[in-house]
Design a protein with these regions (language model features):
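Short, small/polar residue-rich loop motifs at catalytic or cofactor-binding pockets
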Residues: 43-44, 65-66, 163-165
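N-terminal targeting signals for export/organelle localization
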Residues: 1-49
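Short, hydrophobic alpha-helical segments
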Residues: 197-198
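Thiol/disulfide oxidoreductase modules built on the thioredoxin-like
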Residues: 138-193
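A short beta-strand-turn-helix
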Residues: 48-67, 91-94
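Hydrophobic beta-strand anchors of alpha/beta hydrolase catalytic cores
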Residues: 68-69, 103, 168
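Short active-site neighborhood of thiol/selenol oxidoreductases, capturing the structured segment around
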Residues: 60-83, 87
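Structural microenvironment flanking redox-active thiols in thiol-disulfide oxidoreductases
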Residues: 84-142
Length: 198
């Protein structure tokens, strides 16, 4: 009988490669690509409550000045591990200020991503990052608030990918949008922008 390999172990080499590539490239990333700055009154964001390994988490109770949020899923073959690795590099690049920032990974695939799975996945990139899951209704409510696109691709209910938007959201303590970082925004730029809001 073939032993099923979990998403974290399956993509462990890719996670390691993403982290290593970022560390090697960090000093040379000087192409400034501006993050998408949130405008006053932008209809993106808001506090929400989802499940973590420690129980329900209300983002209003995090107690940090800023929150970085990424929406993805643990079976994601490439984009999610790359972006979470980048988010971890930004977090570490803040130095002593990192304690003033929370990092959250929210699943867009709650049917497969249990709380335990998203917790293990998020912590593989940064031990302080929290993984959040919940039922489909609650997840979709949060996705609508954050204007996240996600659509299953494939007919097999147990073996499919999810096409989804990919942005790192930077929110303040009121869960108001401060900046959106695309995959093209380099790490030094992200670090600088996060620091401007601390």
């Amino acid at each position: 009988m073939r032993k099923e390999v979990g998403p974290l172990k399956r993509y462990a080499p890719l996670i390691a490669a993403c982290l290593l590539a970022g560390l090697v490239a960090f000093p040379f990333l000087r192409n400034v690509v501006t993050g998408e700055r949130g405008m006053p009154g932008a209809q993106i964001g808001g506090h929400f409550t989802l499940q973590t390994s420690a129980g329900p988490l209300d983002t209003a109770s995090l107690g940090t000045e800023l929150i970085m949020i990424y929406f993805g899923y643990t079976y994601c073959p490439d984009v999610c591990p790359t972006e979470l690795a980048r988010m971890a590099q930004v977090y570490q690049g803040l130095g002593s200020d990192k304690t003033r920032v929370s990092g959250l990974f929210v699943t867009v695939d709650p049917e497969r991503d249990t709380v335990a799975a998203v917790t293990e996945y998020a912590r593989a990139f940064e031990p302080t990052f929290k993984g959040l899951s919940g039922d489909r209704v609650r997840i979709e409510q949060v996705m609508r608030r954050y204007q996240v696109y996600a659509q299953k691709a494939g007919e097999d209910p147990s073996n499919y990918t999810v096409d989804h938007s990919s942005r790192i959201y930077l929110m303040n303590s009121d869960a108001k949008l401060m900046a959106l970082f695309s995959m093209d925004t380099d790490i030094p730029t992200m670090i600088d922008q996060v620091k401007t809001f601390l």
